[in-house]
Amino acid sequence: MLTLCAFLIVAAGNASAHHSFAPFDLTKEKTITGTVSKFEWTNPHSWVWVDVPNEKGGVDSWAVEGMSPNYLARRGWTKTTVKPGDKITISVRPLKSGENGGMFVRATLADGRVLTQSGQPTD
């Protein structure tokens, strides 16, 4: 019984850590504009990879973490909502580390569609 309790405590801690927002600065929002290089419709989280032109004339790759495909599908997304080659302006909660990445907030595609994860309309 003691072994089972210890296992459940460790498992609960790992599950909680998995869903942590700790890597992201939730007090800030950064907006980037670029071209989608890859969209990963995978569990447990979806990912949008965006190539963003930088000041030096090169390109920075940004990794943007989203919700699970199941969650997004219930809000109208499909695995082709975002495609490589799409022009996109995307807002994120940036990584605290300063690396090029963040947690998805909203995005606007070239055709004017606004994508959110909440299912709520945006301005």
Q: What is each of the regions a protein language model found here?
A:
Residues 34-36:
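Conserved hydrophobic positions within beta-strands
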Residues 1-13:
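Bacterial N-terminal signal peptides
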Residues 74-89:
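Short nucleic-acid-contacting surface segments enriched for D/E, G, S/T with interspersed K/R
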Residues 16-30:
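Short boundary/loop segments of OB/S1/cold-shock single-stranded nucleic-acid-binding domains
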